[in-house]
């Protein structure tokens, strides 16, 4: 997905800003947060965040929920490079693994699970993990307590 922020600001300007932020705020990472195009979820009031390095993905999702005033019964999904990051992962870890060449981490959010699955490596092979509980296979469960 194309970032509106990238479209509006030239690479050199974004890179210089991210470098300045990294030098000035050692305990924070620069994040651009944007809504997935055509998502039925509210637009966020600001896109640029300086996120503490010890914040988890789940805590950042909470920040997004509050900023868009999303009720707790509504689902929200965030994506980094078209994957769903683990909620327990630190933003600093996600930043190191997925930051853009310009120095920003680009996070997209949506009310739908746009990409459908989360990938996980097992024995060097990518395995698909269903995200929606309706995709789970419970046929191996015969009786309670078994």
Swiss-Prot record:
Post-translational modifications: The C-terminal 30 residues are removed by ATG4 to expose Gly-116 at the C-terminus. The c-terminal Gly is then amidated with phosphatidylethanolamine by an activating system similar to that for ubiquitin.
GO biological process: autophagy; protein transport
Residues of the signal peptide: none
Main location per the UniProt record: membrane
Family, per entry: Belongs to the ATG8 family.
Membrane topology: Lipid-anchor
Residues covalently joined to lipid (Phosphatidylethanolamine amidated glycine): 116
InterPro entries referenced in this protein's UniProt entry, alphabetically: Atg8-like, Ubiquitin-like_domsf
Locations listed in the record: Cytoplasmic vesicle, Autophagosome membrane; Vacuole membrane
Cellular component, GO, one term: cytoplasmic vesicle
Keyword Lipoprotein: yes
Described function: Ubiquitin-like modifier involved in autophagosome formation. With ATG4, mediates the delivery of the autophagosomes to the vacuole via the microtubule cytoskeleton. Required for selective autophagic degradation of the nucleus (nucleophagy) as well as for mitophagy which contributes to regulate mitochondrial quantity and quality by eliminating the mitochondria to a basal level to fulfill cellular energy requirements and preventing excess ROS production. Participates also in membrane fusion events that take place in the early secretory pathway.
Lineage of the organism: Eukaryota, Fungi, Dikarya, Ascomycota, Saccharomycotina
The entry's keywords: Autophagy, Cytoplasmic vesicle, Lipoprotein, Membrane, Protein transport, Transport, Ubl conjugation pathway, Vacuole
Pfam families in the record: ATG8 (PF02991)
Site (Cleavage): 116-117
Propeptide intervals in chain numbering: 117-146
Protein name as annotated: Autophagy-related protein 8
Gene name per UniProt: ATG8
Organism: Lodderomyces elongisporus (strain ATCC 11503 / CBS 2605 / JCM 1781 / NBRC 1676 / NRRL YB-4239) (Yeast)
